[in-house]
Amino acid sequence: MSSTPEAETMECGISSSKVHDSKTNTTYGIIHNSINGTDTTLFDTFPDSTDNAEVTGDVDDVKTESSPESQSEDLSPFGNDGNESPETVTDIDAVSAVRMQYNIVSSLPPGSEGYIYVCTKRGDNTKRKVIVKAVTGGKTLGSEIDILKKMSHRSIIRLVHAYRWKSTVCMVMPKYKCDLFTYIDIMGPLPLNQIITIERGLLGALAYIHEKGIIHRDVKTENIFLDKPENVVLGDFGAACKLDEHTDKPKCYGWSGTLETNSPELLALDPYCTKTDIWSAGLVLFEMSVKNITFFGKQVNGSGSQLRSIIRCLQVHPLEFPQNNSTNLCKHFKQYAIQLRHPYAIPQIIRKSGMTMDLEYAIAKMLTFDQEFRPSAQDILMLPLFTKEPADALYTITAAHM
């Protein structure tokens, strides 16, 4: 990674700009994993809620009576073994697969892996809406299904059903009223009681998956879904990876997630661990508190530019860099450190935002530049911000606000 500054200087800004992914033509960007070929998936806004649905344990094979070509293939049990070359998905292929079991109500903008639909289950008189994601081959989706099948937490999106028809895998999940990005855009900055409730749910989800040896790697407001603040879930596990040997020692797991919300160590291609999710969750906490104000400028030209923007806007002190000078962060970016505040003091961009002391302290701890000193999700949940009970009044999303 080059340490030469880009021609254009990034400035701290008040407008949020997600990185554009030209490969998928979606609004919010994805960084593709160059090591294992895994792509992340973007969900879209879910404008309605769904009640609890039964979770099936396996991926079903859907067979038809028309011809042998229409019969499904075994997923063994969640995805192909990597030897099959995924076919190219067309909208017709995806629609045909979805309609084997669901009625399509509407379609959402496609993500990097395939197509996303709002559906109702055939024969379900309740007309409960769900989200069906359809992708050919099932290689990447199979990993996401495998992870979600083992999750059971109130703040993690549930896998309702998964099945395969021909070469298309369909993954069914509950449909929520909106994502957190949309909720903040409509309501934000949020009241403190809502901020605490939502972030507590997110941290609970992260503590749960980290205990199970999973790193999410793409925690952001667009991947958090809710009906109301006390009913929030973390979704989109398309970028998630499993820890090697179930240890949280930093390792090189590849570059994945969203450039704007990645941790410094991930941006620098240094070894990382579950603490990378804590950094991203800290940005979520900040975004809920201040709405559109971010640490980043109006354009992001790459990981180097992003890191320099973080260092500048957070006024990262040289002593806050990793003690290991062989890391990419030290070798290429320590030269941009700023001695405008004491080491580990709360950055001015947080302090001047008018937050409560408990809130700004929690954000500052989560945005600790060196992952070695960044607290875990369980540690954050023990801070005064989350151990104090918030006010009882909680806002419920209604159609009038959507």
From Swiss-Prot:
Gene: US1206
GO biological process: symbiont-mediated perturbation of host apoptosis; symbiont-mediated perturbation of host chromatin organization
InterPro entries: Kinase-like_dom_sf, Prot_kinase_dom, Ser/Thr_kinase_AS
Binding site for ATP: P110, G111, S112, E113, G114, Y115, I116, Y117, V118, K127
A GO MF term: protein serine kinase activity
EC number: 2.7.11.1
Matches recorded under PROSITE patterns: PROTEIN_KINASE_DOM, PROTEIN_KINASE_ST
Enzyme class per UniProt: transferase
UniProt region (Disordered), positions on chain: 1-21, 46-88
Principal location class: host cell
Sorted UniProt keywords: ATP-binding, Host cytoplasm, Host nucleus, Host-virus interaction, Kinase, Modulation of host cell apoptosis by virus, Modulation of host chromatin by virus, Nucleotide-binding, Serine/threonine-protein kinase, Transferase
Protein name listed in UniProt: Serine/threonine-protein kinase US3 homolog
Recorded catalytic activity of this chain's protein: L-seryl-[protein] + ATP = O-phospho-L-seryl-[protein] + ADP + H(+); L-threonyl-[protein] + ATP = O-phospho-L-threonyl-[protein] + ADP + H(+)
Catalytic residues, chain numbering: D218 (proton acceptor)
Localization of this protein: Host cytoplasm; Host nucleus
Lineage: Viruses, Duplodnaviria, Heunggongvirae, Peploviricota, Herviviricetes
PTM section of the record: Phosphorylated by UL13 homolog; this phosphorylation regulates subsequent phosphorylation of UL31 and UL34 homologs by US3. Autophosphorylated.
